[in-house]
Amino acid sequence: MVLFHSQASCSKRIEADAIILPFWKLKDKVKCAASIAKEYESLYQVALDNFSAKSREVELIYSCGQGKEKRIVLLGLGKNEELSSQEVLEAYAKATRLLRKAKCTTVNVVLPTISELRISIEDFLTNLTSGILSLNYNYPKYTKESSNDPLLTKVNVLGIVPKIADRIFRKEENIFEGVYLTRDLVNGNADEVTPQKLANIAKGMAKEFPSMDVKILNKDAILKEKMGLLAAVAKGSAVDPCFIVLTYQGKPKSKDHTVLIGKGVTFDSGGLDLKPGKAMLTMKEDMAGAATVLGILSGIAALELPVNVTAIVPATENAIDAAAYKMGDVYTGMSGLSVEIGSTDAEGRLILADAITYALKYCNPTRIIDFATLTGAMVVSLGEDVAGFFSNNDVLAQDLSEASAETSEALWRLPLVEKYNKALHSDIADMKNIGSNRAGAITAALFLKRFLEDQPVAWAHLDIAGTAYREKDEDLYPKYASGFGVRCLIYYIEKFLSK
């Protein structure tokens, strides 16, 4: 993907469907933030009666044949002294949605006068690029004729030296290839995005990037490894499970190794503990954790980061037939720990448990970070805009929080309340797979933590149940799959581990 281009001169810009002009909100007036303002002043001056330039405000007007663009987007950046990275991100995302609805495919973007910016030009460009890329995506609709708005095909950023801008553009484009991969997988039909499909995606990535290797465990290999929890969840499906291990070695001589684990339930019926029909409608997205870790590896491989990262994906359906695993039964995982099934709809933690054990046995991890659409309790707690996370390591938690703030992908650390472990007590097994009807996100995290078995490895669990999928178009995300977490984790890996 090469969408963005840069040009130092505004006067030599190419013709385009539209131009984006930035504006500051002053005390008693509106001021165009770009030096090119005079060329269009007679046109936009009339529109300023209804345009206050408050942060994220957008207005579309026509150029009436004046200049090299057919339309002009007035983009409000608010008060200069209050400008934040997130406001830049959301403002250009909003402008992108407006342009696409107007059927524009090419756009010239005029930067504010650099000396007036309160954030660095690198920060401004990064968030401008991310904002546009986030909404330059189409959900794969299955209608006979496409009803999607056209995508932007060329974005020409004016008033910046290419040497500075192009590096940022290529980096963000590579990251968003990973975001789009995540979205495509989550949005795909469950009958198409099967465990084997995820395995094939991983194989394709290993072929594309020389620094990657892949290992796929089929059903027989899963049983041979005694992954009794993953095997139990898979019993009710006509589709065989897969266990995917995709390794990126960007620094082979280093012993530092990050393992990312993604829940890969490609469709979750709830099993014999059947979900209500309405709750099942979005359950093709229950593999968003798997899609996220594959998207992250795509991004770090494209950026050629000097790190060692392995993505592990336990992939299966949670379906129903006569052989489906049953409530009240006990199954033993790869760790040797036994689990009484209190609910067949608490399957995600079971397959993650075997993945954690595999990582500890074979990967020698420095840290493990898992991603899962794990609990409805997290959605109730934090909604769609914030993902809750748990960690046994304060440094890891702080670094993830910083990455969250820098990328505007909100994470909130929640407590691992050891007292709540008693909710997982079983009289006949080492534990149950579900607690009481309270603190469900915490007890799910405590369940996973048990499978670390006190080994000295840093661990974080990200419950993305609320953030992975959107019911409607939002400021930064299109409807349906969001790709949440890919940008945050790539930032974390690049800043804190690429040394």
UniProtKB/Swiss-Prot annotation:
GO molecular function, one term: manganese ion binding
CDD domains assigned: Peptidase_M17 (cd00433)
Active site location: K275, R349
Enzyme class: hydrolase
Disulfide topology: none
InterPro entries noted in UniProt: Leucine_aapep/pepB (IPR011356), Macro_dom-like (IPR043472), Peptidase_M17_C (IPR000819), Peptidase_M17_leu_NH2_pept (IPR023042), Peptidase_M17_N (IPR008283)
Catalysed reactions, semicolon-separated: Release of an N-terminal amino acid, Xaa-|-Yaa-, in which Xaa is preferably Leu, but may be other amino acids including Pro although not Arg or Lys, and Yaa may be Pro. Amino acid amides and methyl esters are also readily hydrolyzed, but rates on arylamides are exceedingly low; Release of an N-terminal amino acid, preferentially leucine, but not glutamic or aspartic acids
Keyword Ribonucleoprotein part of the UniProt annotation: no
Region forming the signal peptide: none
Cofactors: Mn(2+)
Sequence positions that bind Mn(2+) 1: D268, D345, E347
EC number of this enzyme: 3.4.11.1, 3.4.11.10
Membrane spanning residue stretches: none
Keyword NAD: no
PROSITE patterns tied to this protein: CYTOSOL_AP
Primary location: cytoplasm
PANTHER family: CYTOSOL AMINOPEPTIDASE, LEUCINE AMINOPEPTIDASE-RELATED
Function: Presumably involved in the processing and regular turnover of intracellular proteins. Catalyzes the removal of unsubstituted N-terminal amino acids from various peptides.
Family membership: Belongs to the peptidase M17 family.
Name used for this protein in its record: Probable cytosol aminopeptidase
Natural source organism: Chlamydia caviae (strain ATCC VR-813 / DSM 19441 / 03DC25 / GPIC)
Source taxonomy: Bacteria, Pseudomonadati, Chlamydiota, Chlamydiia, Chlamydiales
